[in-house]
């Protein structure tokens, strides 16, 4: 999106929103900005396109001076008078899932709970679950996915975590305040 003109950003977002409505019958209000993509002027264009929140790599926050423990809640940003909610994607989760045994994920989420950190966000590439070299055998052949799903069920039953949509997280977790992220 940052490589597109303002008008093209809005149009690109509208195309995707229309497709999601046709395909799934939903009106998407958020998006995932992949692979460390960010420009300070994006909020104005995204809000103009009907976006109220974006999932972004935590790296954008960390290079600005945020500490990791601060990234377990939503933040707000703005440009051109338009405000946008930001959900920092947890880098640790990206490296645990699916590359490490699910017990390590459980340990990490229990640590976050003990520290009373209210949120951990994951948005990641689907090809990690079988498309990358060696991942099909690990995820499917050696049972990682089954163990992962069992671990999630246990964590939910134990009250360690709840799986929620980004909109639900925004409604239930107090934002940290304003964050102005660099390019």
Go through each PLM region and give its residues:
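Conserved beta-strand positions
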Residues: 33, 55-56, 124
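Residues at the N-termini of beta-strands
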Residues: 30, 53, 119-121
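Acidic, His- and aromatic-enriched active-site or binding-groove loops in soluble protein domains
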Residues: 10-22, 26, 47-82, 149
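Distinct, well-ordered alpha-helical segments
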Residues: 39-47
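Metal-dependent polysaccharide deacetylase catalytic core of the NodB/CE4 family, i.e.
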Residues: 1-35, 82-96, 117
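Short, solvent-exposed turn/loop segments enriched in Gly/Ser/Thr/Pro and often Arg
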Residues: 30-39, 167-170
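Flexible loop residues that form catalytic
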Residues: 36, 59, 127
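Active-site and substrate-binding clefts of carbohydrate-active enzymes
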Residues: 70-84, 88-92, 96, 103-183
């Amino acid at each position: 999106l940052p490589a597109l003109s303002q008008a093209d950003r809005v149009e690109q977002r509208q195309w995707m929103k229309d497709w999601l409505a046709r395909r799934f019958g939903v009106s998407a209000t958020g998006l995932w900005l992949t692979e460390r993509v960010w420009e300070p002027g994006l909020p104005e264009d995204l809000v103009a396109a009907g976006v109220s929140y974006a999932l972004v790599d935590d790296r954008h926050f960390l290079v600005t001076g945020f500490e990791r423990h601060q990234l377990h809640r939503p933040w707000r940003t703005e440009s051109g008078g338009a405000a946008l909610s930001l959900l920092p994607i947890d880098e640790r989760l990206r490296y645990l899932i699916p590359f490490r045994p699910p017990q390590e994920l459980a340990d990490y989420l229990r640590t976050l709970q003990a520290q009373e950190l209210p949120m951990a966000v994951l948005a990641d590439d689907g090809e990690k679950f079988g498309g990358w070299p060696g991942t099909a055998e690990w995820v499917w052949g050696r049972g990682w996915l089954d163990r992962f799903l069992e671990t999630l069920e246990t964590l939910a039953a134990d009250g360690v975590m709840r799986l929620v949509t980004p909109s639900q997280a925004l409604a239930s977790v107090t934002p940290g305040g304003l964050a102005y992220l660099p390019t």
